[in-house]
Design a protein with these regions (language model features):
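Residues on the lipid-exposed face of transmembrane beta-strands in outer-membrane beta-barrel proteins
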Residues: 1, 54-58, 119-123, 185-189, ...
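Post-signal-peptide, soluble extracytosolic/periplasmic N-terminal scaffold domains
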Residues: 1-60, 69-71
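Extended N-terminal export/anchoring regions of large proteins
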Residues: 1-12, 108, 112, 126, ...
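Outer-membrane beta-barrel channels and translocator barrels
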Residues: 4-6, 49, 60-63, 126-128, ...
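Transmembrane beta-barrel strands of outer-membrane/channel proteins
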Residues: 11-17, 58, 67-71, 133-139, ...
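Solvent-exposed loop segments that connect transmembrane elements
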Residues: 24-40, 77-107, 143-173, 209-238
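Residues that define the transmembrane beta-barrel architecture of outer-membrane proteins
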Residues: 48-52, 59, 111-117, 177-183, ...
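Long, internal scaffold/assembly segments composed of regular secondary structure
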Residues: 120-134, 138, 175, 188
């Protein structure tokens, strides 16, 4: 806390560090080979979240002003875990009788960052009249390295590149960016006895600034074979998404 004895200019510097380790609840899935077992195993947990913050304000007789900035960092130290398939000794391309992956790899939450800056005011007038406003802008980013399409070493892309190789990917990392803007205004007053007036306005905008990645194929059918994917107007990335961009 800065200036703890000065109520006119209060300021606070904060730091939050949260480390979680151990295991989450049981998780897992199917390993698609000639035998399709389903596994439930404890999901490893090892993540670190840090938040750096700064808040300051200016108080005066007719109201106050305030501003803040926060920087949040999330680091997942257990990004993947692998399950062996006891019914499949080696990797192979799936056929009607044999084949499939000898292992399954599960990808957990990637590292990501967020920055938020905000400022606001509150003004006081006669007849219990109050006027306030807040503005907050944020930037969310995620640029963790991609993992290969599959862990199955036997699958090839149409160009002959091994699908478990990083060179088969359209790019090496996501380079994701999202901008947010929040605007909030409030007004209240009691101009005469028995009459109260209140009004408010709130606006929120989220803009995805991530560049489009075209994916023309994958091994989404559980690591068994390469599948060609054709982008369409509804699935511009080659996969169904929550929104049409």
């Amino acid at each position: 806390r800065i200036n703890p004895e000065n109520p006119t200019f209060p300021a606070v510097v904060s730091y939050l560090r949260e480390h979680k380790s151990g295991y989450r609840t049981l998780t897992g899935g199917n390993v698609r080979a000639q035998v399709n077992p389903s596994y439930e195993v404890p999901e490893p947990l090892n993540e670190l979240t840090q938040d750096f913050g700064l808040r300051a304000a200016y108080n005066f007789g007719a109201g106050h002003l305030h501003a803040a900035f926060n920087r949040n960092l999330y680091n997942n130290r257990a990004e993947t875990f692998v399950i062996d398939d006891p019914f499949q000794a080696f990797d192979s391309v799936n056929t009607s009788t044999v084949g499939g992956p000898s292992r399954a790899r599960f990808i957990n939450t990637p590292d990501n960052e967020a920055s938020t800056a905000s400022a606001g005011f509150l003004l006081k007038f006669a007849r219990q009249t109050r006027l306030g406003g807040d503005l907050a802008v944020g930037r969310w980013t995620q640029d963790a390295a991609f993992y290969p399409y599959t862990i199955n070493t036997a699958i090839l892309t149409p160009t002959g590149v091994r699908a478990d190789s990083l060179s088969a990917l359209p790019q090496k990392s996501f380079d994701g960016k999202i901008n947010t803007t929040m605007l909030n205004f409030t007004f209240s007053s009691r101009p005469v006895k028995g009459l109260a007036l209140r009004a408010g306005f709130r606006s929120y905008d989220l803009t995805n600034k991530t560049k489009r990645i075209i994916i023309t194929g994958d091994t989404a059918v559980s690591d068994r074979a390469w599948t060609v994917v054709t982008p369409t107007a509804d699935n511009p990335y080659g996969h169904a998404t929550a929104n049409v961009y």
